[in-house]
Curated annotation (Swiss-Prot):
Protein's UniProt keywords contain ATP-binding: yes
Positions of ATP binding: 39-46
GO biological process, one term: positive regulation of DNA-templated transcription
UniProt DNA-binding residue ranges: 853-872
Entry keywords, A to Z: Activator, ATP-binding, Carbohydrate metabolism, DNA-binding, Nucleotide-binding, Transcription, Transcription regulation
UniProt-recorded name of the protein: HTH-type transcriptional regulator MalT
Species of provenance: Salmonella arizonae (strain ATCC BAA-731 / CDC346-86 / RSK2980)
Domain (HTH luxR-type) ranges: 829-894
Highest classification ranks of the organism: Bacteria, Pseudomonadati, Pseudomonadota, Gammaproteobacteria, Enterobacterales
Function of the protein: Positively regulates the transcription of the maltose regulon whose gene products are responsible for uptake and catabolism of malto-oligosaccharides. Specifically binds to the promoter region of its target genes, recognizing a short DNA motif called the MalT box.
Protein encoded by which gene: malT
Record InterPro entries: P-loop_NTPase (IPR027417), Sig_transdc_resp-reg_C-effctor (IPR016032), TPR-like_helical_dom_sf (IPR011990), TPR_MalT (IPR041617), Tscrpt_reg_HTH_MalT (IPR023768), Tscrpt_reg_LuxR_C (IPR000792), WH-like_DNA-bd_sf (IPR036388)
The keyword Disulfide bond is annotated on this UniProt entry: no
Subunit and partners: Monomer in solution. Oligomerizes to an active state in the presence of the positive effectors ATP and maltotriose.
Amino acid sequence: MLIPSKLSRPVRLDHTVVRERLLAKLSGANNFRLALVTSPAGYGKTTLVSQWAAGKNELGWFSLDEGDNQQERFASYLIAAIQQATGGHCTTSEAMAQKRQYASLTSLFAQLFIELAQWHRPLYLVIDDYHLITNPVIHDAMRFFLRHQPENFTLVVLSRNLPQLGIANLRVRDQLLEIGSQQLAFNHQEAKQFFDRRLSSPIEAAESSRMCDDVAGWATALQLIALSARQNNHSAHQSARRLAGINASHLSDYLVDEVLDNVDVSTRHFLLKSAILRSMNDALIVRVTGEENGQMRLEEIERQGLFLQRMDDTGEWFSYHPLFGSFLRQRCQWELTAELPGIHRSAAESWMEQGFPSEAIHHALAAGDAQMLRDILLNHAWRLFNHSELALLEESLKALPWESLLENPRLVLLQAWLMQSQHRYSEVNTLLARAEQEIKGVMDGTLHAEFNALRAQVAINDGNPEEAERLAKLALDELPLAWFYSRIVATSVHGEVLHCKGDLSQSLSLMQQTEQMARHHDVWHYALWSLIQQSEIQFAQGFLQAAWETQERAFQLIKEQHLEQLPMHEFLVRIRAQLLWAWARLDEAEASARSGIAVLSTFQPQQQLQCLTLLVQCSLARGDLDNARSQLNRLENLLGNGRYHCDWISNADKVRVIYWQLTGDKKSAANWLRHTPKPAFANNHFLQGQWRNIARAQILLGEFEPAEIVLEELNENARSLRLMSDLNRNLLLLNQLYWQSGRKTDAQRVLLDALQLANRTGFISHFVIEGEAMAQQLRQLIQLNTLPEMEQHRAQRILREINQHHRHKFAHFDEGFVERLLNHPDVPELIRTSPLTQREWQVLGLIYSGYSNEQIAGELAVAATTIKTHIRNLYQKLGVAHRQDAVQHAQQLLKMMGYGV
């Protein structure tokens, strides 16, 4: 819940001086990316900009305090301010900020700018007191903001110092409007106007000018002069002489003498007590100060000129001038030391009554009241956790004694979930074990089950599925149905374990249950996770169309709940890319993989390994080995600089081994094979994948017998576990083994099985990646004309993809090849005496590659009748009558030239 006053522009008071000369300068702010107003405290920055902002509807205002150094809080208020300025235009960004569903501030801002691209009118955002920001992550994000904000957007920053926003670069590019303390200082005319409005008796212009010079135009000093003159009935000039040369760092003594000591005791106590509030309203004042009418008292203090300012148009929220507020808080610590904890407790109670637990925690911490802090956390901590208020929660839990946590074990559970969210897995188990050992009395069974659900999640994340399954089952046996969050966690973990074990049907059922529970209770990240797992399971079962449809539901969930910037979004676009690759939709697969990299752009480069692997796969399927090598260099660098799940390593090794196969790099394959550990099992898709990598390397090295043993065992496991996509891949690799070892009948048998299974999986690229050896076999099957209709259609499609991407169309019949062929001693006499033209050689190459007449015409960009003429001529020159005879003749020529066909 956002505090309204932080989003309200300060009210323009009637007695303030209108700074016409500065307003004229600010009138051109829309021509700049950044308008920067800097000066020490008390020079009128906020007053000036609030005057300029008056009447501007499309302007948001964000007043900072120290708590805004938390990234999530900063983002929530900034987006809310822009929503006020645009009338709710940026709904997606708002939802992402409210639910903390973004990877980083920069990625949230990127989404914001996408929405603002449709906003065409001038737009302003004012950020006041930016000097309070000390978080370098926020500085980095705001530099990104300034670089990429729309041209019609102006950021206005008010700060006591020069902010770390790349000011020099903006200044050089003439994109910066600056107003500093020298310009903000009152001139003689403005000082005269000021005193005329504040003092009951007018003063001469010369005297006014002299006082202005004495304090160097410092607005706060002028205000103090007027206040002192009213309270003490002595001349304003006497006050001016006291303030001459003074600055903010030496102001405390003056404020004590001239302000605090000149108000009655009641007002003094009111000022000191209320100053602990960063912002205040009637209810807060009544509780903190004991005044019966807080609103009336606030308005009275405002009328007395005691540096209190309204924060919104309704007049409900107030705050002290930062300089005066800081002074009062310091004095409060000195003068009301004994009362201060009680004052903070009262403030916390009032904030709680108004529904602001984060502010209440701030005061409970300041009060040092562990019991109050504990009670707030027991009632509100999980909501704060779900809204990613992690830093505040961590600070709060550290402030509680361990005994208090033991007395309230759900707070121990909260602390453990905080550790889990930060990937501190070993600390989670240590904390829970210590708590179980030291909790007095018998531990509640439900709480123990919640501990086990969390432990199960930690175990699966840490690569320990056996322990994860044991703990998840224990949790589910003991958790009541009402404990939905822990039941969702445990059910999800159990489903994931069964997926790892190859029990796909039961795993799918549990993931569907997880989705239903998560949707019902609005636990959206687990709903998305369960959909991703369902899609992976369906892919493994060979039901790729069902996997596609599940992915569509996941994309819809991401859109509806604004989950675009969760890291899980990358997982979804990655498995979509895998599916598109399988179906030979390579351009779409590449685009999807690149979008996954974009989702992870703010994370460590190692997180991009899987998507980079897919980019290599796309290059390999296209036959673009140069590009594949370039991408592999980066991939291998990442492999050497990270610790990865076996699934990630298996996928990365797959593209490396395929690349070595396509380039004949036996040395690299042999070296990899020597150092690669062999998995103990092959009961899931990633273990099957790594064994397949081993078999492919063995085939490349001519180690056919051990490779065949591996593949036969993989097929047995795949059939028993219904890992149909893996079976399809295994059959294709077994086909290559048989083909290369000269067992052509066996090769044809398993290829027919693979084609039949592809009717279910839809695989195309898995065939294409095997290149010319696959093309030759498919040509033969097509020429036999015995394939069922679906297999025939798929074989023709695969052949077209191989011809398109691997450039086997007529590469063997180029001019250089033909010249060498004609000079070969064994060339048939018919070809030597009646040579083909270059175009006829090209046509022969395309016939050999399986092209129809229409496809040849399209490839060579000539009429179909012209192709028929070329075919008739080359048939006559070769002495053949049928297409199949021409293919066999071309194959004989290639063998004669030493090509392994």
